[in-house]
């Protein structure tokens, strides 16, 4: 059994969903491990990770709009406002989604469905560089 750690950086342009599947698959293909488990963890509290459909961009649009409605940018609603009107809503959205994803790896392939992709869900308005820790365990 082996373990490999790796970190990728994703540059966001503000709120939205950013597909990082290709970066992860590219890294995975270079590893000696053929079968195992891959855990991906985002090292931030105002962005998150989701597995979502990659075929119809309307899915991503609707997902973002849904979360904007349940966690609106209105400082009157929140006590934590020192980092801007988007900060507390970003924390709420991150709490309602995932900060880590675990996937099986079989024959060097991520076990994703046909229409599934890995997304970083940026909840802040401004651009950020987000770090994603990859921990691969297997043989």
Predicted regions and their residues:
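Active-site histidine-anchored catalytic micro-motif
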Residues: 1-139
